[in-house]
């Protein structure tokens, strides 16, 4: 079962990316290193509700 999620920057707290994940394979919160246009650098983005 795939669900849509939002990824928020850990530094500026803005929700920059939307993606989906498989809840059966990834039960915890997803963390990806993505580019933040407001910080102008790559930061860790975490899954939000």
From Swiss-Prot:
PROSITE patterns reported for this sequence: RIBOSOMAL_L33
Species this chain originates from: Nitratidesulfovibrio vulgaris (strain ATCC 29579 / DSM 644 / CCUG 34227 / NCIMB 8303 / VKM B-1760 / Hildenborough)
Keyword Ribonucleoprotein: yes
Gene Ontology cellular component annotations, sorted alphabetically: cytoplasm; ribonucleoprotein complex; ribosome
The UniProt record lists the keyword Ribosomal protein: yes
Pfam families hit by this protein: Ribosomal_L33
HAMAP family in UniProt: Ribosomal_bL33
Family, similarity comment: Belongs to the bacterial ribosomal protein bL33 family.
A biological process from GO: translation
PANTHER family: 50S RIBOSOMAL PROTEIN L33, CHLOROPLASTIC, LARGE RIBOSOMAL SUBUNIT PROTEIN BL33C
NCBIfam families from the UniProt entry: PRK00504.1, PRK00595.1, rpmG_bact
Organism superkingdom: Bacteria
UniProt name for this protein: Large ribosomal subunit protein bL33
GO MF annotations, alphabetized: structural constituent of ribosome
Record keywords: Ribonucleoprotein, Ribosomal protein
